[in-house]
């Protein structure tokens, strides 16, 4: 909770409206909404009401005096993030718009803009999209005299992306490629990955996988930074 005006509890009318909303939830959804202490992770299948439960929880927190700037909600897709934003704004007009709601990648991009120095990045770093990634990979493969008919650029991009999704950097991937022979292309991709990453670093560029890797790396390596951001969201 916050003692400032931004975190003051909402009116009785809004509270009554929240009770009406709670009556529409099943027991599992209601348990998510009414849990007001600490973080909550919601796992469920498609169409089971995950977004509803999360958005109602945000509205419930606001109704109980939590300042919107101290609430963070992240999801995997732009569609889900957009639904969260529109639903919360409709439930709590004027305050719902100030809640941090985004995809994981979007949140990490914002975090890195704010904490670029802690992440070892210049303030002017750029983000490469899929087309940019493929262009760099194509250039690296040309330098290595590798042909697309033997190893497609998309295959390389996907393998690098999977590695980054697992928080495996280029050097670790190269070392592991010498041990695990689970893919005939792994050692070749390891060399491409290494050179690809060197070119991104030289251009002060991040791809989508880097957004999460660099954010996680900064938080893991800096206790003060981690505590500050942990305290930011309640």
PLM regions: where:
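N-terminal pre-P-loop "Q-motif" helix
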Residues: 22-36
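Base-recognition residues in the alpha-helical recognition helix of bacterial helix-turn-helix
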Residues: 56
């Amino acid at each position: 909770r916050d003692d400032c005006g931004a975190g003051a509890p909402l009116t009785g009318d809004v509270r009554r409206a929240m009770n009406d909303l709670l009556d529409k939830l099943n027991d599992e959804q209601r348990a998510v909404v009414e849990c007001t202490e600490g973080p909550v992770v919601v796992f469920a299948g498609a169409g089971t009401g995950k977004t509803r439960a999360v958005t109602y929880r945000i509205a419930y927190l606001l109704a109980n005096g939590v300042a919107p700037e101290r609430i963070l909600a992240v999801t995997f897709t732009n569609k889900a993030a957009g639904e969260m934003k529109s639903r919360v704004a409709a439930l709590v007009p004027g305050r719902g718009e100030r809640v941090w709601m985004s995809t994981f990648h979007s949140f990490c991009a914002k975090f890195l803009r704010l904490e670029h120095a802690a992440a070892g990045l210049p303030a002017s770093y750029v983000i490469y999209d899929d087309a940019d990634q493929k262009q760099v990979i194509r250039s690296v493969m040309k330098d290595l005299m590798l042909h697309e008919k033997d190893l497609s650029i998309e295959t390389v991009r996907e393998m690098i992306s999977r590695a980054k999704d697992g928080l495996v950097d280029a050097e670790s991937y190269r070392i592991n490629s010498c041990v695990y022979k689970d893919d005939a292309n792994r050692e070749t991709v390891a060399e491409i990955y290494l050179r690809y990453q060197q070119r991104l670093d030289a251009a002060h560029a991040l791809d989508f996988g880097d957004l999460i890797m660099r954010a996680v790396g900064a938080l893991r390596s800096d206790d003060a930074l981690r505590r500050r951001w942990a305290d930011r969201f309640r």
